[in-house]
Amino acid sequence: MSILRTIAMFIYLFGYMILHYGILRRAERAAAAGDTATVEQIVNQHIPRWSRGILKVTGVSLSVEGLENIPKDRPCVFVANHRSYYDIPLLLAGLEKPHGILAKEELEKIPLLNRWMKLLGCVFVQRDDVRASVRALNDATAIVESGRSFIIFPEGTRYKGEEGGAGEFKAGAFRIAVKTGAPVVPVAISGARGLFEARGNRATPGTVYVPVSYTHLRAHETELHL
């Protein structure tokens, strides 16, 4: 059954994007014309729907607590732990609206997905290239400065250790919050890895818990940890 769910996940993942290709093109034309309202309307409708569909076909239930802690009057930087491929659709489905993500460059090579991610405001980073990483962080900073929230995985890659653990946080990711003065919203994803990677990359039903907290770190306080 887990094999069938995994196959269904990939069929749905790309099938949705193929079936809605016309909508993707409409959003891209709107972006080229500077019609940000249309782009936002399309992104806010389809990306959460696509993400929820991935969870549904794989039998994953999402339990989110603390959405009331997200600031409503200003952009923020969501800081999430990273343990599973599920993490991105979980955040896109679970937060109050989808936000751009600091994502690894490999995702930019996936057809259709890369175009939706660019519309969302994702920034792709070459983790082994210092200059490219700095440019990516500057691009992400500009997005927050424009009034849009952003998601970062400060570990820089998926942590493969025991549940509840975390990898080493990369200081550079926090500079987005430092430079913009945006509040940091920690997001803890629990249980995702056990439903896929720990099962030999086979989709397994279960529940993922995502508590959302809030902290407003002032720039000089954050710099002490960089």
Language-model features: locations:
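Membrane-interfacial terminal anchoring regions of lipid-handling membrane enzymes
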Residues: M1-A33, A37-Q41, Q45, L62-K72, ...
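Catalytic core of membrane glycerolipid acyltransferases/transacylases, capturing the structured
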Residues: H20-A33, E40-N44, K56-T58, K72-V130
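Short, basic, glycine/proline-bearing loop/turn elements
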Residues: S51, C122-Q126, T157-R158
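Hydrophobic residues at beta-strand termini and immediately following loops
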Residues: V125, V187, V212
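Membrane-associated lipid acylation/remodeling enzymes share a hydrophobic transmembrane-juxtamembrane segment
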Residues: V130, V134-R202, Y209
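Acyl/amide activation-and-transfer machinery of modular secondary-metabolite enzymes
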Residues: T207-Y214
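Conserved small/polar residues in nucleotide/adenosyl-binding loops
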Residues: T215-L224
